[in-house]
């Protein structure tokens, strides 16, 4: 649901930029998305009828709504700079996992699981190898941890990279 919300929002922002003859840049796209969602966290985070809302109530993580409100700061600051590097797609994902309070991880594994995964991602980021990435994947499967929010943010980074370039 988070990826659909985010990509729909970014497509709407893209359309508005085109309609207003504004340049399509990552900054313009994300700034407009932030304007379009200003206050969404405060307005919508009172309920607990989704995993994201329940995690917000329990841990304070803002999830996809917070990312949108921030103009997808995690995508711009953590993922996008990695994409041009060798193994950039892996490094972008690891950078996101290492720093984002992923609501899916919190839902499945709590703060302890999130801290474990973030620590592993930071270590792997600095000493990257495909085999170590595969090992982390197996460990996540064994622990029933899925950084789905970070995967959504990576998809957003790919989308932004493709429409900007």
Language model regions located:
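Conserved phosphate/anionic-ligand binding catalytic regions in large, soluble enzymes, centered on
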Residues: 1-11, 143-158
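Phosphate-rich cofactor/ligand-interacting catalytic cores and adjacent structured alpha/beta frameworks
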Residues: 14-144, 161-165
